[in-house]
Design a protein with these regions (language model features):
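Conserved ANL (AMP-binding/adenylate-forming) active-site segment centered on the GW(Y/F)…HTG consensus within
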Residues: 589, 621-626, 646-647, 664-691, ...
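AMP-binding/adenylate-forming catalytic core of the ANL superfamily
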Residues: 380, 542, 661, 666-667, ...
Length: 813
């Protein structure tokens, strides 16, 4: 900026000199009566010589201009963190490698000349080598090259910018690959004063024709509109930073690169109308009761039910008096399993600009009533048939008299009386353009408005109302779709209950908003029913919990061929047990990919993915490590910190897990104090304190040790109850014995281990003896063993730790 005035003045001076010179020349031509055509010849010659001279001196400027002209016809580039690029001085640019044109994105974002590092096998091709040499390309091989490393160091020392992609290869799965240590070797001979490392992250090219995503995913991502590309540059790092430190920063920068896309997202209701209009004749849902439902029918009914919901609210004259930390819109209760009815009601509630609250029908009457009171729910959409099924299972729900139950069966009868209106609506949906439908039915574009309230599992205490806005949910859907490489021919099994974030976001909203067919099945514990639904409909993506997947693996009626169509199986909501992973893979020949998250993160934060083998370079693109919960999703950052002072810990050091991302919740309903405890803003990112203990390895894979609340302090040592359960599982038959470890206070040792065991009377004593006589560490051996009828579980299949501890206390008296 200081030199800008001098540059402009100098430019104006030379322009004036040139104009004066040509004016004098034109005067001479007139005086001596020379044909004016020769003047134009002379001007053309001067222009040609000048252009050739500039091309020789500044070839990169011409290329940058040409790139911009060509690139901006198809793409729109947004640069975040440009202020972190030094105006002068040496720097090493390090970032992710997602496509063949990443170098072009970097060069267009930075006006300075950049020396790019290129794989020697590409550089050596004779027909491009001569051009690459002109632009100072630095060739390097995968085995390393002393000359190339010295050249990189030389350019940095001379004050130039050098760009290197430390993965050394294009990503095959959209995630970061292993960072090679070549740049560390290049910087060894440099001092910290010679330059800095500038990390960067590119978003928007995964799924393009220039990436190595699969054909089906690329086909889904083709668009006639300009593709939005974002590149985010981070703050300067020391030149001698290690590869795992740089990779961690690149991961965090993905948050900034995703920022513009997430901020520009529609509401869920508007996104639904767009998707439905694009796929009117396609099947949206196949329901076990309702049959095949097309997008045309689904959109028509969702718009019609929206009127019904608004009318009911008006009739009931509902005007909730909200607290200071609660949304102003009315909350509508939904008490339905995974089904067409549930999906339709959720969409209609959002179109009506209300808040959807999917109630946990397995939580017990006390917890259910507390949730209804906290959210100030006056009306609940449910089904008589479903309530009868719950009653047959011993779940009797008694609602207060001020709660209005609206049964889906009655809605169906009401709709039958209005067939003409519904038919008219269907015609309108078919004819009217998407933008007009949105302006009529969903005029609000505020993606920060609260969309849903989900009550947390309550596995360790009272359920908390988690407020998620439209941006939270749409961001997480986009992230998940990217890493799963969703295809047009994918079919997703929707069997997880919608009161769980995993079921609502991943198996309910994702297929509907991504234009993917879903198969609804209301009971995930019905192994044979699930398997039949998968086999009959060629399901390709199945999500479940360790508990549910274990049920399928142990069921003798299920055959491997029933799950043959599955291309990916994802486990979440609870830790995937080793025996479940092994048994499932042996029986069905399908790997389970474990993920991680929380209701507070909408829910997915990280997930394992299939590994890819690169035959060009004989490399494994590793996206799956057994025992881990995968790498953070694109746009998500994970930090491991000291729980006492929030200082960052190094790779492989256990600490408190923080999750940052656009999917981090707004807060807890009517509980700002608790929200402020678990959500902290650091470096411009909102971080959620998970309460989990774990670590990141050098490649960025996340490993969970246990929850901090699931540690017992015995004789001064912190012992993980989860680790105890893993050790015990090695010595007993987990197919016939279920167990859970908890801890109780002890006057001498601080705490003592209690083991609750679910098994037959005949084998209880044998199980206890097997554990007592095993070679597990003495500190891991329980003090008390209690036989119980059934391990308490939540609706998601997770162990109800709160009830387990209460049960242990009562038994120990």
């Amino acid at each position: 900026e200081n030199e800008l005035g001098q540059i402009l003045a100098g430019n104006n001076f030379f322009q004036n000199i040139a104009m004066l010179g040509f004016l004098l020349l034109a005067t001479l031509f007139v005086k001596f009566e020379i044909n004016v055509i020769y003047l134009f010849y002379f001007i053309a010659l001067v222009t040609f010589i000048g252009s050739f001279y500039i091309l020789l001196k500044l070839p990169f400027s011409l290329v940058r201009i040409l790139l911009s002209i060509a690139f901006l016809q198809r793409y729109r580039l947004l640069v975040e963190g440009f202020e972190n690029i030094p105006e002068k001085g040496g720097a090493l640019l390090l970032g992710n490698h997602i496509s063949f044109i990443d170098w072009a994105v970097v060069q267009m974002a930075i006006p300075r000349k950049i020396y790019f590092v290129m794989e020697r096998s590409i550089y050596s091709k004779w027909y491009i080598k001569i051009f690459l040499d002109k632009f100072g390309i630095i060739p390097v091989s995968s085995t390393g090259s002393k000359t190339s490393l010295e050249l990189i160091a030389k350019h940095i020392k001379e004050g130039n910018l050098v760009c290197l992609f430390p993965e050394g290869t294009l990503s095959r799965h959209g995630q970061l690959n292993e960072f090679k240590a070549g740049f560390e070797l290049a910087c060894e001979c440099l001092s910290e004063d010679d330059g800095k490392i500038i990390p960067f992250y590119i978003r928007g090219l995964w799924g393009s024709a220039f990436s190595r995503s699969d054909e089906e995913f690329s086909a889904r991502n083709r668009t006639l509109n300009k593709r939005k590309i974002a590149i985010a540059f981070g703050k300067a790092m020391p030149l001698h930073s290690k590869k795992d430190e740089v990779k961690a920063k690149v991961f965090e920068l993905s948050f900034m690169a995703w920022k513009s896309q997430c901020e520009a997202m529609h509401t869920i209701a508007r996104a639904w109308i767009d998707t439905a209009k694009k796929n009117l004749n396609q099947i949206a849902i196949i329901d076990t009761l309702a049959g095949d439902i097309s997008y045309r029918k689904m959109l028509t009914l969702s718009l019609f039910l929206n009127f019904f919901i608004k009318r009911k609210s008006k009739e009931l004259n509902i005007n909730p008096q909200r607290g200071s930390y609660a949304p102003k819109e009315e909350a509508i209760g939904i008490l339905l399993p995974a089904s067409f009815a549930s999906s339709l009601t959720n969409l209609s509630v959002l179109i009506a600009e209300k808040i959807a609250v999917n109630l946990n029908f397995t939580a017990g009457e006390k917890a259910l009533k507390a949730a209804i009171k906290n959210a100030q729910i006056s009306q609940i959409y449910t089904s008589k048939t479903f309530l009868e099924k719950l009653a047959n299972k011993g779940i009797n729900l008694n609602f207060d008299t001020n709660i209005h139950l609206i049964y889906f069966e009655d809605i169906v009868e009401d709709f039958k009386m209005q067939k003409t209106k519904i038919f008219s609506m269907m015609l309108a949906v078919s004819i009217i353009p998407s933008f007009i439908l949105k302006s009529i039915f969903t005029p609000s574009k505020n993606n920060l408005a609260i969309a849903v309230i989900l009550f947390s599992s309550g596995s360790e205490g009272s359920p908390k109302g988690v407020m998620l806005n439209n941006r939270n949910i749409l961001s997480n859907i986009a992230q998940i779709s990217d890493v799963l490489c969703t295809r047009n021919n994918d079919v997703i099994l929707s069997s997880l209950p919608p009161f769980h974030a995993f079921g609502l976001t991943v198996t309910t909203f994702l297929p509907l908003l991504e234009g993917i067919k879903s198969i609804t099945f209301s009971d995930p514990t019905d192994a044979l029913g699930v398997a039949k639904a998968v086999a009959k409909n060629n399901v390709t993506i199945m999500c479940g919990t360790s508990t549910f997947l274990g049920i399928y693996a142990r069921n003798k009626k299920l055959d491997a061929l029933m799950f043959e169509s599955l291309r990916i199986v994802v486990s979440g909501a609870e830790k995937l047990k080793n025996e479940v992973r092994t048994t499932f893979e042996m029986k069905f020949k399908k790997s389970i990919f474990e993920g991680y998250g929380a209701t507070e993160t909408t829910p997915v934060a990280s997930v394992n993915l299939p590994n890819h083998f690169d035959v060009d370079y004989w490399l494994i693109h590793r996206a799956n490590k057994e025992g881990s919960v995968g790498m953070p999703l694109p746009g998500t950052a994970v930090r491991i910190v000291n729980p006492n002072n929030y200082e960052n810990l190094k790779a492989n050091e256990d600490g408190l897990i923080l999750i940052g991302g656009h999917q981090v919740m707004v807060g807890y309903l009517n509980d700002k104090e608790k929200t402020d405890e678990v959500v902290k803003e650091i470096d411009g990112i909102r971080w959620y304190n998970t309460g989990d203990k774990g670590h990141l390895d050098e490649d960025g894979f996340l490993y969970i040790v246990d929850r901090y609340s699931r540690f017992a302090k015995i004789g001064g040592e912190m012992i993980s109850l989860g680790a105890i359960e893993e050790e015990i599982a090695k010595f007993i038959d987990t197919e016939v014995v279920k167990f859970c470890a908890t801890s109780l206070e002890d006057e001498k040792k601080g705490e003592q281990i209690v083991l609750l065991i679910e098994c037959n009377n005949e084998i209880f004593e044998g199980v206890c003896e097997a554990i007592k006589n095993s070679n597990i560490p003495t500190l891991f051996k329980p003090r008390y063993y209690f036989q119980i009828e059934k391990i308490p579980l939540l609706g998601s299949g997770k162990v109800d730790l709160k009830k387990v501890k209460e049960l242990a206390k009562n038994l120990a008296i």
